[in-house]
A protein has these predicted regions:
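Active-site neighborhoods and metal-handling regions in enzymes and metal-associated proteins
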Residues: 1-254
């Protein structure tokens, strides 16, 4: 396992990339409404990243991915490909943004609701959000990856939901997906010991039904096997000398 420790200069570049990724999510919210296609949302984000931000959308052509963002609607767990699908009132959509600026990546996602959300969708999103933060709050030098996973898993399962196991968080920096893998389940005190200067994503995918998923024939889109809803939130996080720093906070939370 090759886990990179970021220098202070690299940490500053990660802060910039993280803020830009969060700014895209701040910007796109007003466009998430009935009748818009996921492809149109992708184009708006692409133009904003490449034009306004003078940055690079990391997903575009990454291992053959054809678009600049991921849009995962309702029972889509992750890596949904934007296209002709029109959003309708009641839909829940995760928008996942990764930008590259000055060689470094910032990666974050949020849930958005189209019109009035269903009660279960709103609750599922809230549990995913809370679980992400419970995991993040475990991060500090001397803590372990298993501390993050256990905190997330316990909270999700307490709510009678389930944690997806096939997909996880990851180290991030000059490379989109670096070591280590950040599992959203596990046992406290196990796994890699955290050190100051590590940067990684925490991004639990939480299913309303069972945890099992399947990959669609497009090779990217992951859906729940039981066709029930899924929700996800994601932040890029730096381990600091005293704890953690979230690099992808939206403007309202900075």
């Amino acid at each position: 396992m090759n886990v990179t420790i970021k220098t202070p200069e690299e940490q500053d570049k990660m802060r910039i990339a993280g803020r830009l990724a969060a700014d895209v999510l701040d910007m796109i919210g007003e466009y998430v409404k009935p009748g818009v296609t996921t492809g149109e949302l992708d184009q708006i984000c692409h133009d904003y990243i490449t034009g306004t931000q003078d940055a690079i959308p990391a997903p575009l052509n990454y291992r053959g991915f054809p678009k600049s963002i991921c849009t995962s609607v309702n029972h889509v767990v992750c890596h949904g490909i934007p296209g002709e699908r029109k959003l309708k009132s009641g839909d829940a959509v995760n928008i996942d943004i990764t930008v590259i600026k000055d060689g470094f990546h910032g990666d974050t996602s949020r849930m958005f609701f189209v019109g009035k959300p269903a009660i279960q969708a709103e609750r599922l999103s809230q549990v995913a959000f809370e679980s992400m933060w419970l995991g993040i709050r475990q991060m500090a030098p001397g803590k372990f990856l298993g501390d993050i996973g256990e905190a997330i898993q316990k909270n999700v399962e307490k709510q009678r939901f389930s944690v997806v196991r096939e997909y996880c968080g990851h180290g991030i920096g000059r490379v989109f997906h670096e070591d280590p893998q950040v599992l959203h389940y596990g046992r406290a005190g196990t796994g890699l010991e955290l050190r100051a200067g590590m940067t990684m994503t925490v991004e639990p995918m939480v299913n309303a039904g069972k945890r099992h998923v399947r990959l669609l024939p497009d090779g990217w889109t992951v859906v729940t096997k039981d066709h029930k809803l899924s929700a996800q939130w994601e932040h890029t996080v730096l381990v600091t000398d005293s704890g953690f720093e979230v690099l992808t906070l939206g403007a309202a939370d900075r």
